[in-house]
Amino acid sequence: GGLDNYSSSKASAELLFKSYFHSYFRKNYLSIATARAGNVIGGGDFKKDRIVPDVIKSLQSNKVVFIRNPNATRPWQHILETLSGYLILGEKLINKKLNSKIIPNWNFGPNRKNCKKVKFIVQSLINEWGEKNHKIIIKKSKNFHESKLLSLNIDKAKKELSWKPNLTLNETIEFTVDWYKSFFTGNDVEDLSNQQINYYSHK
């Protein structure tokens, strides 16, 4: 990374953490780590200029879907995948169950087959919403550079934490659309969230 603002900011954060860890914390055996996730999606995200919330808002209001970088490949994952990794890591840190020689940087991302292009995710969201022919317009931004490919190596988390992603990409899309549909129709999203958590935890 480092050729665009996004990846360079992540690399800078890791370097800063590493310098503090080796300078102040390593000798004290302090349980500390950094954790990075992929492109997290799921219900409850309404932030502006994010692919999934923007697509959902367009579908809900029956407006054209605009996408900026359709051929960019991203490591898509549901928020429950990310949180499960963070919780496992946190438990290991609290109980000091990690080998102190392991570098304390962790990636929690999807399996490689879940790394898909933006246009694939957008069309999948549209299909799951039930609007297969919804209009999409590509609106390229000239303001900044974006990497064509972002990915995460999750081998260490699998090996050292016995963590792995459990949801297929189809399930991730279904969970996401189901949550937003429930929200916009006034249904109990807390109950649905609990159902999704229960499904995930028993998968």
Regions of interest found by a model, annotated:
Residues 2-33, 56-60:
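Active-site Tyr-X1-5-Lys
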Residues 59-203:
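C-terminal substrate-binding subdomain of Rossmann-fold SDR/epimerase-dehydratase oxidoreductases
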Residues 1-5, 26-51, 73, 107:
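Flexible, glycine-rich beta-alpha linker
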Residues 15, 53, 84-88:
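Short, contiguous clusters of charged residues that form electrostatic/catalytic patches at enzyme active sites
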Residues 9, 48, 150:
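Short, conserved glycine- and acidic-residue-centered signature motifs
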